[in-house]
């Protein structure tokens, strides 16, 4: 999926490019792309580190969204097909 398509699908309003939902969707696309890359190149340690960084950023954004707007958080994780955060 292209970046523009993701932004259009998850934007809150027409000129929205940086809302939490859009950021999470873009990071999820990067996670999927990097995961596919690492299946073929499992010793690419720089990409593994990058994947862990992206996952951490996405986790922080999801945590923020779950506290700020739980309804849109639930909708977003179901739409993206990702697991909910563990409650500690």
Swiss-Prot record:
It comes from the Eukaryota. This is Small ribosomal subunit protein uS15c. It is found in: Plastid, Chloroplast. Pfam families: Ribosomal_S15. Gene3D superfamilies: 6.10.250.3130, S15/NS1, RNA-binding (1.10.287.10). The gene is rps15. PANTHER family: RIBOSOMAL PROTEIN S15, BACTERIAL AND ORGANELLAR, SMALL RIBOSOMAL SUBUNIT PROTEIN US15M. It comes from Chlorokybus atmophyticus. GO terms for biological process: translation. Keywords: Chloroplast, Plastid, Ribonucleoprotein, Ribosomal protein. Belongs to the universal ribosomal protein uS15 family. Part of the 30S ribosomal subunit. InterPro entries: Ribosomal_uS15, Ribosomal_uS15_bac-type, uS15_NS1_RNA-bd_sf. GO terms for cellular component: chloroplast; cytosolic small ribosomal subunit.
């Amino acid at each position: 999926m292209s970046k523009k398509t993701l932004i259009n699908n998850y934007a809150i309003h027409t000129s929205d490019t940086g809302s939490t939902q859009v950021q999470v969707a873009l990071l999820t696309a990067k996670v999927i792309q990097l995961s596919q890359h690492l299946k073929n190149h499992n010793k690419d340690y720089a990409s593994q580190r990058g994947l862990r960084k992206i996952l951490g950023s996405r986790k922080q954004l999801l945590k923020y969204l779950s506290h700020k707007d739980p309804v849109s958080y639930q909708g977003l994780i179901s739409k993206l097909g990702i697991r909910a955060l563990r409650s500690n």
